[in-house]
Amino acid sequence: MKCPKCNSTHSRVVDSRHADEVNAIRRRRECEECETRFTTFEHIEKRPLIVVKKDGTREQFLREKILNGLVRSCEKRPVRYEQLEDITNNVEWKLRDEGRAEISSREIGEHVMNLLMHVDQVSYVRFASVYKEFKDVDQLLQSMQGILAENKRSDS
């Protein structure tokens, strides 16, 4: 590991512990040359996931895109950032557990919406309105009626 100050490759681990992230280890290191302390994170190497978009193009899966979309849909809503990270983590785990190399953007959106609906329904409608590309208010109302029907079933 290179020291961020002097670029020396000689450092020693001062402290190791599990990070807040899943499957990560936080290591506190000290450079043996300049004695600068710095932190590194060790993660399990993940096989790349390829997302097949609606137009057929392919790109590498980026969890940040899910998180950014969730943050936008939850603006000014009583949703904690940690909840959005949990949704993002759950979606990524589910996709990786399926063991496929390629996944459609439609499937990713469905996973996100299923989890978001249980966190905040207004944020769900915001996310769905962008994801599903509603053409008019009638389509949006149909989606909202589906939520209301789901609420009635779960309340019974």
Curated annotation (Swiss-Prot):
Keywords: ATP-binding, DNA-binding, Metal-binding, Nucleotide-binding, Repressor, Transcription, Transcription regulation, Zinc, Zinc-finger. Coiled coil: none annotated. InterPro entries: ATP-cone_dom (IPR005144), NrdR-like_N (IPR055173), RNR_NrdR-like (IPR003796). Residues 49-139 form the ATP-cone domain. The keyword Repressor applies. Binds 1 zinc ion. Pfam families: ATP-cone (PF03477), Zn_ribbon_NrdR (PF22811). A zinc finger (unnamed) spans 3-34. Its cofactor is Zn(2+). GO terms for biological process: negative regulation of DNA-templated transcription. NCBIfam families: transcriptional regulator NrdR. PANTHER family: TRANSCRIPTIONAL REPRESSOR NRDR. Belongs to the NrdR family. Negatively regulates transcription of bacterial ribonucleotide reductase nrd genes and operons by binding to NrdR-boxes. This is Transcriptional repressor NrdR. The gene is nrdR.
